[in-house]
Structures are given as structure tokens and as C-alpha cells.
């Protein structure tokens, strides 16, 4: 959250025109507008991919394999629009802070950002965090079942 505040306070979001500020606040608005079920399911799918990336990187022998193992699942989670609570702890405050700064008022005029509030952050983080926990636990259970479960004699 501190990084989001510094980025907003330094007017980084308008360095290259208004499009970046509009994109940041629009992303935050989309995240704050998710239903509980959508946040939960996107959180599960996201952390399945994040944990899979870590698992692959541990299994890879070469540095290139480790990088590819991390990169591809993370790329997929970003491209699919899945939700991760840690990422949202940046994205949503990065949308909240410009809304409170008069320097961004002209750039953000006409943008529907009514959901971008601290309550919106909480309404996103609760289901997404639960989903992340369930997704990580699901992959952990699969790992346990496949590799660590002792066969019945």
C-alpha cells in the first residue's frame, strides 16, 4: 500500500498522459466490483497457478527451467484476470489514492469509480484471500496424494 501511495503522490500515473491513471483506477474499479463467488473462484484458480509455478521451479534443474517454470503459470494467471490478494493490496489502493488527489480530478472525470473505496478493498480481499488459501491447499493436497501418500500394504 505504501508503494501505491508513493506512486500516486508522485503523480506517476500521469507521467505519460491520462491513460495510465484511467487504467489504474479502472482496474481497481473492476476488482472492487467482483461478486463474492467470482472473487473466490478467481482466487482459487490464481493460487493454483502460483503454487504450480513454485512447484515447477523447485523441480527444474537449470536456471532457465526455473525461470520458465515461474514465468509461464504467472503469465497465465495475469492474462486470465485471476485474483491474488497480495497483488490486489497494491492495485486497489493504487486506484483509491488518485481519487482523493485533486491533481487527478480532470483525468478521472467521467470514470465510474464508486466501488473503489477501502470497503471495496475489504470486499475484494476477503473472498480472494479465501480463494487463494483454497487454491494453495488444493495443490498441496494433490502433491501429497501423488508423491507422499504411502501405499497401503
Name these PLM-found stretches.
Residues 1-153:
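Alpha-helical transmembrane segments and their helix-helix packing motifs
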Amino acid at each position: 500500500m505504501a508503494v501505491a501511495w508513493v506512486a500516486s503522490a508522485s503523480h506517476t500515473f500521469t507521467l505519460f498522459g491520462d491513460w495510465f491513471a484511467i487504467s489504474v483506477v479502472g482496474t481497481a474499479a473492476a476488482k472492487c466490483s467482483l461478486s463474492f463467488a467470482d472473487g473466490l473462484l478467481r482466487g482459487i484458480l490464481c493460487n493454483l497457478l502460483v503454487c504450480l509455478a513454485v512447484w515447477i521451479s523447485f523441480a527444474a534443474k537449470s536456471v532457465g527451467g526455473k525461470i520458465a517454470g515461474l514465468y509461464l503459470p504467472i503469465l497465465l494467471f495475469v492474462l486470465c484476470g485471476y485474483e491474488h490478494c497480495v497483488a490486489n493490496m497494491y492495485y486497489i489502493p493504487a486506484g483509491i489514492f488518485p481519487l482523493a488527489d485533486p491533481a487527478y480530478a480532470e483525468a478521472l472525470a467521467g470514470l465510474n469509480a464508486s466501488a473503489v473505496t477501502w470497503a471495496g478493498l475489504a470486499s475484494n480481499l476477503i473472498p480472494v484471500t479465501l480463494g487463494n488459501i483454497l487454491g494453495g491447499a488444493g495443490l498441496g493436497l494433490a502433491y501429497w496424494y501423488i508423491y507422499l501418500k504411502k501405499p497401503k500394504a
